[in-house]
Curated annotation (Swiss-Prot):
Cell division inhibitor that blocks the formation of polar Z ring septums. Rapidly oscillates between the poles of the cell to destabilize FtsZ filaments that have formed before they mature into polar Z rings. Prevents FtsZ polymerization. It comes from the Bacteria. GO terms for biological process: cell morphogenesis; division septum assembly; regulation of cell division; regulation of cell septum assembly. Interacts with MinD and FtsZ. This is Probable septum site-determining protein MinC. InterPro entries: CAP/MinC_C (IPR016098), MinC (IPR013033), MinC_C_sf (IPR036145), MinC_N (IPR007874), Septum_form_inhib_MinC_C (IPR005526). NCBIfam families: minC. Gene3D superfamilies: 2.160.20.70, 3.30.70.260. Keywords: Cell cycle, Cell division, Septation. It comes from Shewanella halifaxensis (strain HAW-EB4). Pfam families: MinC_C, MinC_N. Belongs to the MinC family.
Length: 221
């Protein structure tokens, strides 16, 4: 029997959702550039769904938004929570309408494996633990990036960037023996160096997400 040349099957994927809260394209572009500068390689080529629930103006420039994203090598696959007029405009430029439902609000799949790196992560290096927790037995230097869909445990000093819950896991944590990070992020919520200093993160600590805000808890050395 001849194998069919194509098959249509249902599946699920983790997509980042970009919430738009302004009609001003210049403001959107500037804030997007600021976020991309934090971890450019992590966001490069990332597929996005744009949430327009906060936009009521029917003259919102969806085409302009699409150009802003594509010019920065981000891929907009569709929109969600838009008013009927904006939904119509989006369809006219080839964007899908993504409906929210039980499948969209369900918890991300919890990582089932652990990736262990038994060495220092140096400037310019990026370690990504896909669908896994990440353990670093060593330090993470300035300019280095460690990313995990699950939690990140660092048995050393964190000086670079650590991004846990990259697949949307809001229960992920970041733990390190000493935190001097350039950036920490859990499920898209992030702190920069100044935020860490303001919240007293310096020695051994555990960073987690509570609601929409990060918190840090000191751990015994």
């Amino acid at each position: 029997m001849q194998t069919p040349s194509l098959e249509l099957k249902g599946s699920s994927f983790t997509l980042s959702v970009l919430h738009i809260n302004s009609n001003d394209m210049a403001v959107i572009a500037a804030e997007l550039d600021a976020k991309l500068a934090i971890a450019p390689q992590f966001f490069l080529g990332a597929p996005l769904v744009v949430n327009l629930s906060a936009i009521q103006a029917t003259d919102f420039d969806i085409l302009g938004l699409k150009e802003i994203l594509t010019n920065r090598q981000l891929i907009i696959v569709g929109i969600t929570s838009a008013c009927p007029e904006l939904t119509k405009q989006a369809k006219s430029i080839g964007l899908a309408t993504v409906k929210t439902g039980k499948e969209a609000t369900s918890q991300p799949q919890m990582p089932k494996t652990t990736k262990i790196v038994k060495q220092n992560v140096r400037s310019g290096q990026q370690i990504y633990a896909k669908n896994a927790d990440l353990i670093i037995v060593g330090a993470v230097g300035n300019g280095a990036e460690v990313i995990a869909d699950g939690s990140i445990h660092i048995y050393g000093t964190l000086r670079g960037k650590a991004m846990a819950g990259a697949g949307g896991d809001r229960h992920a944590v970041i733990m390190a023996q000493k935190i001097e990070a350039e950036l920490v992020s859990i499920a898209g919520q992030y702190w920069l160096t100044e935020n860490l200093q303001q919240n007293g993160a310096a020695l051994s600590g555990c960073i987690r997400l509570e609601g929409e805000s990060l918190t840090v808890e000191s751990l015994p050395l």
